[in-house]
Amino acid sequence: MRYSVKIIFMKNEHEMRIQITKEQTEDGQLKLSQLFLIFQNIAGEHADLLGCGYDDLLPKGLFFAITNSRAEIRRMPKEGERLILRTCIGKVSHLFCPRYYRLYTEDEELLAESAVRWVLMDLQKRCAVNPADVK
């Protein structure tokens, strides 16, 4: 199934530049699993910069879990290709924390975009926590 992902990037955008390695590819193209790992890596780096990364949340007994995601892939990157990855977070709504991603070539050709909804979870209780309640 194909989803249309409409993304409005905000001031809290974070950017990462990467190059696709042979280990990330199959038949010369980026593996789908590697695409989502790249998204996960930039999300983690951005969360760390915002003070809500893994090392910030774990001492509070909290973690982020993905509830759903969707992506539109126009073309998979090729081995050796240099890319620009951008992410931003959206407005929290009913406990859900949206995060958006866009993947470009160095020439700004849009290759893929994705939207993911995260929820903040209590590690012990295994229930959702409102981010506004966390200090």
Protein language model annotation of sequence segments:
Residues 5-66, 109, 113, 122-135:
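Hot-dog-fold acyl-thioester-processing enzymes
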Residues 14-16, 69, 85, 99, ...:
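Hydrophobic residues positioned within well-ordered beta-strands of beta-sheet architectures
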Residues 70-106:
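Hydrophobic beta-sheet segments that form the core/acyl-binding groove
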Residues 118-120:
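A short acidic/small-residue loop/turn micro-motif
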